């Protein structure tokens, strides 16, 4: 599973667990991106922090491991380089690349897109409220792609960062160890005023 993981959250972990069970995978390898070219328009936390948060978040699951293949490679991170490196390291393995269906819809904009499907099968995880464009879906080779419906956890890394920057809790959105890591290193300093638009007129029942 490739991703920026800035930060990693329970949505990532549930998706990985569901796909592992669906395909009876021996392991799920989490691959934090080094320098994500798609996100050059915003600040991204240092790769080492994102790697360590991923290690913390996945430590309890014996089928989860974390790779440094992308963060130890210099230059922008491209999926084609990730898969070539993993294929060289694991020549006998059948590789499945797990990503969100929104990212999958853009796959033909990725570097050396045609070669990607020769290196791995792709698993597109559905997200709450997201419908993949039929035209985009029609361009993807169905024998190399599987769409998997994931239990609806409406969590995103963007929301976790913004909550932290507003001084709001991220408990139960990210693993406990990641909450403590964020606090220790103050990765997302408070810069946004608290959200005062919430309806607090009724007590929770």
Curated annotation (Swiss-Prot):
It is an enzyme of class 2 (transferase). The keyword Lipid biosynthesis does not apply. GO terms for molecular function: ATP binding; nicotinate-nucleotide adenylyltransferase activity. InterPro entries: Cyt_trans-like, NadD/NMNAT, Rossmann-like_a/b/a_fold. Pathway: Cofactor biosynthesis; NAD(+) biosynthesis; deamido-NAD(+) from nicotinate D-ribonucleotide: step 1/1. It catalyses: nicotinate beta-D-ribonucleotide + ATP + H(+) = deamido-NAD(+) + diphosphate. The keyword Nucleotide-binding applies. One of its GO terms (biological process) is NAD biosynthetic process. Its EC number is 2.7.7.18. Keywords: ATP-binding, NAD, Nucleotide-binding, Nucleotidyltransferase, Pyridine nucleotide biosynthesis, Transferase. Belongs to the NadD family. Catalyzes the reversible adenylation of nicotinate mononucleotide (NaMN) to nicotinic acid adenine dinucleotide (NaAD). PANTHER family: NICOTINATE-NUCLEOTIDE ADENYLYLTRANSFERASE-RELATED (PTHR39321), PHOSPHOPANTETHEINE ADENYLYLTRANSFERASE (PTHR39321:SF3). This is Probable nicotinate-nucleotide adenylyltransferase. The gene is nadD.
